Amino acid sequence: MGSIALFLLVALIKVVLVIFVLLTAVAYTVWLERKVVGRMQNRWGPTRVGPFGLLQPLADGLKFILKEDLLPPHVNKPLYILAPMLAVAMALLSISIVPFGGTLTIGHITTPLQITGIMGANGQPVDINIGLLIILGVTSIGVYGIALAGWSSNSKYSLLGSLRASAQMVSYEVSLGLSLVGVLLLSGSFSLREIVRLQQGGFWNWNIFGGFQFIAFFIYLTSAYAETNRIPFDLPEAETELVAGYHTEYSSMKFAMFFMAEYANMVTVACIASILFLGGWSGPVPGFLPPILQSLVPVFWFCLRIFAFLFIYIWVRGTLPRFRYDQLMAFSWKFLLPLSIANIMVTALFVALK
C-alpha cells in the first residue's frame, strides 16, 4: 500500500473512531446527568432499560429516530433543515483539532492521537500551530445554527430564544477568549501540543498553579457554561418563558441534533480546559507509573480530567438557579470582562519580570 493511501486510511480510521467515541461520550453524559441530578433530587434516575439504566441512551436514540419528523408549513424549509446540521457539524469539527495524547504505535505505523495531527520528520507528532485559534473560530460559528433555527422557525418563542442565545454567546465569547491570553503569554504558542509540553514534569508546572492562572481558569469555566447554554446560563431555553426556546418547532432527530451539539461542545470545552490549565494528558507526578503503561496512561489522565469537568457541569445544574437575563449580561460585561483584562495585565507583568 502506498504511503498516501496508508495515510488516508489511518486518517479515516481516526475520524470514525473519534466521532464514535464522542457520540458515545455525549450519550452517556446525558445518562450520567440524569443519574446524578436524580440522586440530588432524591430520585433514582434511569433504571428500567438495562442494568442501572445503562441502555437508556440507546432507547432515547431509538425513540428520536422513530418519531415522526414534522416539517411545519410556516417555516423557511432550507434554513430550518440546515440549522441543526450546522450546529452538529461545528461541534464535531472543533473536536478534530484537539489532541488526546502523544502517539499510538501499531506495528510499523505511528500516528498522533489527533485527527488533524501528523508525524514530523523528527519522529515527533506535529499539529496545527494555530489550533487554539481555529477551535475558537469554529465554535463561534455554531451560533449561526442557533440564530438560523430561531429565525427560520417563524415563531416568536423560537426567535426570542435564538436572539437570547446569540447575544449571550457573543458576549461570553469575549471574556472566554481573553481568559486564554494569559496562557498564550506564558507558553508563547497557539499549538495545543506545545502548551501541554511546557506543562510536563508535575502538577506544579500546570498553568493553573505554576503560571498563577487560577483567575483565568475561573473566567474560562464560567464563560464555558454560558457558551454551552447550561444552567445557570440557560436563558435561551427558559421553559417558563419561551416554551423550549429555539427548539420549539423541532422534533425527531432535528431536535436531538441540537442537544448532541450542546453536549459535544461540553466535551470540547472540557478538553480545552484540561490542555490549557491542567497539563493536558501529562500525569500529576512524573515517573509515577511503570514504563509499560506510559503509552496508554496519558489518555487515561486526559479522560479523567474531562470526566471531572463534565461532573462539575452536572453538579452546577443540580445546584444553582437560573439568572435573570439582565443579570446574565451584566455579569459578562461588568465583571468577567474587566477581570479578564486585569488578568492579562498581571500575567504580562509576571512574564516580563520572570
Swiss-Prot record:
The record's GO CC annotations read:
plasma membrane
Q: Which GO terms describe its molecular function?
A: NADH dehydrogenase activity; oxidoreductase activity, acting on NAD(P)H, quinone or similar compound as acceptor; quinone binding
GO BP term (any one): aerobic respiration
TM helices/strands, residue ranges: 4-24, 81-101, 130-150, 170-190, 201-221, 269-289, 296-316, 333-353
Q: Which reaction does it catalyse?
A: a quinone + NADH + 5 H(+)(in) = a quinol + NAD(+) + 4 H(+)(out)
For this protein, the record's InterPro entries field holds: NADH_UbQ_OxRdtase_su1/FPO (IPR001694), NADH_UbQ_OxRdtase_su1_CS (IPR018086)
**Domain of life where this protein originates:** Bacteria
Which cysteine residues pair off into disulfide bonds? none
Tell me which positions the record assigns to the signal sequence.
Answer: none
Keyword terms = Cell inner membrane, Cell membrane, Membrane, NAD, Quinone, Translocase, Transmembrane, Transmembrane helix, Ubiquinone
Q: Which Pfam families match?
A: NADHdh
Question: Is Membrane one of the keywords?
Answer: yes
Q: Where does the record say this protein resides?
A: Cell inner membrane
Annotated EC: 7.1.1.-
Stated membrane topology is: Multi-pass membrane protein
Does the keyword Transmembrane feature in the UniProt annotation? Answer: yes
| Family that this chain belongs to | Belongs to the complex I subunit 1 family.
Q: What does this protein do?
A: NDH-1 shuttles electrons from NADH, via FMN and iron-sulfur (Fe-S) centers, to quinones in the respiratory chain. The immediate electron acceptor for the enzyme in this species is believed to be ubiquinone. Couples the redox reaction to proton translocation (for every two electrons transferred, four hydrogen ions are translocated across the cytoplasmic membrane), and thus conserves the redox energy in a proton gradient. This subunit may bind ubiquinone.
Summary of subunit composition and partner proteins: NDH-1 is composed of 14 different subunits. Subunits NuoA, H, J, K, L, M, N constitute the membrane sector of the complex.
Q: What is this protein called?
A: NADH-quinone oxidoreductase subunit H 2
Question: Where does this protein come from, organism-wise?
Answer: Koribacter versatilis (strain Ellin345)
Source organism lineage?
Bacteria, Pseudomonadati, Acidobacteriota, Terriglobia, Terriglobales
